[in-house]
Structure formats: C-alpha cells, structure tokens
Amino acid sequence: MKHLTLLLISILTVSVCFAQSDDDRWKKKYINLGFIITTMSQDGLPDLKDNYGASFTVGRTFYLHRPIGGVLRFGIDATWFDINYTNYKIKHITYWGTDNYQYHQGEVSMHIGPSITIRPVNKLNIHGYFRYAPSFSALYANDTFYGNYATFFVGGASISYGVIGLGFETRFGDCKYKELGSDGDEQSSFINKTKHNGWKAYLTFRF
C-alpha cells in the first residue's frame, strides 16, 4: 500500500510538472522595441511623413482556455503601456527664403483586444491580434505644446522562437489637439482633426 501511494504521488507530481512546463511554452508577457513609419494629415493641408519614430511596449496575453489540439489558443491582450514618439521635418519655402523646422509628436496609451496564438512546434509561437488603444497624444509645434485624448486602433502579428521574435503592426487613429494650458476655445485648437496612419516593425521579447 505504501509503495502504491508513493507511485501515485510520483505520477501526480510528474503530471503537474509536465502541465506547468507545457503552459510555460505559451509565452504570456511581451516587451516590444519598434521603429515607426507614419503619416499625419489634415483636410486641406499637405500630408506630413515622418522623419523617424520609435516605440516601447509592455503587456500580457491572458489565454482563455487550454490549447486546442495542442497548438491553438485564443486570448485577450492587455498592453499596460505603449509609448510612441515621431519626429517630423518641415520645409517652408517662401519668396524670402526657406525655413526648416520640426514637429515632435507622441502618444502614451493602453491597449486591449482579442488575440490568437499558434504553436506549431515546440518553441515557435505565431501571435496575431487587434486592439483598441485609448491614448493621450501630444504635439510640440511652433514653440507650442498641444495635447488631447486620441482614439487609436492597432492590429498586427509576430513570430517568435523561444524568447525573441519579430513583429509587424499597423496603427491608425485621430486627435483634435488643443493648446495645453489654454481655456479650450476653438482658436486654441487645430481647425480639423489630425489623422495618423502608419505601421511599426518591432523586436519582441516574450516570457
């Protein structure tokens, strides 16, 4: 009886360890470092294409069920924070000469949305997602700071082997900037909404 009890305990321990080990292969946490290509536009004005941009993202995937067929899981992605910075160079040509100046634009946001993860082989993970990204967007232009709430959406996919991988993401949204510190009247904001549309490529670390 004693030997049977020890055998059952051993089998249970091995089963639990195997389940934990298998679950660990489904990486939940992610840290992304990316570069951005984006366009900022307003009705009636020329589109502005970025000079360069960068991003930093931290989040986690919450899986909704055990693996289907051992290879497929659906989940909810929660990005705790996503920081994006974009630099624009503007050349203003007039009769009297050419002026060069810059816009600095950025967002701080959180994301939430559905995702799908496929693990066809042991360490290979393919992850696809679409997220709603409420943001605070800021713009420094003409020696003035502007900012406001912005609505963004992001969608993309990544492929990783073990801890490290590569990803691609499209992002789009709009914002009506207002001068920070002003009384919020119409003269202190841009006349039209500013639209942002672009993509990012990123290096991802999953744990």
Per-range role (PLM):
Residues M1-K27:
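Cleavable N-terminal export/targeting peptides
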Residues Q20-H65, H196-F207:
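Short glycine/proline- and aromatic-enriched beta-strand/turn motifs that initiate or cap beta-hairpins
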Residues Q20-K28, F62-L72, R119-I126, S160, ...:
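Short loop/turn motifs that connect adjacent beta-strands in outer-membrane beta-barrel proteins
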Residues D24, I31, M40, Y146-F207:
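Predominantly the C-terminal beta-signal and adjacent terminal strand-loop region
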Residues K29-F35, L72-A78, I112, G128-F130, ...:
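Membrane-embedded beta-strand positions of outer-membrane beta-barrel proteins
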Residues T38-L48, W80-Q105, S137-N148, K176-K195:
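Flexible, solvent-exposed loop segments that connect beta-strands
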Residues N51-T57, Q105-H111, Y149-V154, H196-K200:
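Transmembrane beta-barrel architecture of outer-membrane proteins
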Residues T79-F81, E107-T117, V121, N125-S137, ...:
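Detector for outer-membrane/organellar transmembrane beta-barrel domains
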